[in-house]
């Protein structure tokens, strides 16, 4: 491995991460209780009044809040629709997340495409500019069909939750070459027909493999391409 690649890997490890894992067959309160026990804090409570989405939360030893929320896109009984939303994580937290997922699976949690489950990966957008985000959009547009094939995404999910880069967005993006994030946001929302409610969580523009709505509202670059399956390990 040459020095340049080694440096790139080390820089990647400095990025912040947020993960949303959809599952069913486990109640949100039970998942939060299990997480609190796993973290060794025993602290979990109903936080729906603050977070909405029928949320139960658990706290780890660092005081970070891990949320278990209802997501209507998940199949199954309402009380067992459960989406784990992590706090801001770092590279060294990946093993912690993996072990928590194992605990949830052993407690009965199920997650696969037949249950309407997916994974959303958020990477901190710090350091990105309109230029780097334009580059990323072009790279994604050139490779997302390969990604979809590799991840075996079904056509229904792609048409609803994991849409490819809108060609109108890409055309305007490359024509105007925005110099500010505000100008980039204008192109994003207008091209996706979602100029209304730009600050709304469920703005329709979010349902793309490459989701820049998260960039403008949460400061992350979000990928919606991943199907979810809790595997044996």
Placement of each model-derived feature along the sequence:
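Midchain, well-structured core segments that form catalytic/ion-binding scaffolds
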Residues: 120-124
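C-terminal accessory/tail domains of diverse enzymes
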Residues: 1-113, 126-233
């Amino acid at each position: 491995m040459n020095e340049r690649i080694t440096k790139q890997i080390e820089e990647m490890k400095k990025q912040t991460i947020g993960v949303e894992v959809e599952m069913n067959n486990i109640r949100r309160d039970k998942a939060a209780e299990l997480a609190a026990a796993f973290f060794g804090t025993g602290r979990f409570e109903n936080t729906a009044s603050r977070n909405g989405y029928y949320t139960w939360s658990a706290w780890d030893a660092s005081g970070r809040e891990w949320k278990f929320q209802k997501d209507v896109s998940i199949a199954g009984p309402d009380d067992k629709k459960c989406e784990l939303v992590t706090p801001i994580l770092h590279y060294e937290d990946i093993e912690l997340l993996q072990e928590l997922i194992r605990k949830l699976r052993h407690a009965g949690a199920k997650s696969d495409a037949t249950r309407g489950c997916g994974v959303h990966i958020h990477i901190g957008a710090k350091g990105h500019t309109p230029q780097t985000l334009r580059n990323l959009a072009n790279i994604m547009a050139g490779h997302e069909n390969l990604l979809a094939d590799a991840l075996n995404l079904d056509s229904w999910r792609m048409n609803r939750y994991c849409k490819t880069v809108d060609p109108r967005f890409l055309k305007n993006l490359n024509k105007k070459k925005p110099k500010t994030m505000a100008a980039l946001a204008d192109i994003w929302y207008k091209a996706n027909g979602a100029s209304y409610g730009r600050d709304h969580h469920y703005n329709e523009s979010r349902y793309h493999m490459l989701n820049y709505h998260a960039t403008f509202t949460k400061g992350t670059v979000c990928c919606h391409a991943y199907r979810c399956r809790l595997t044996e390990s």
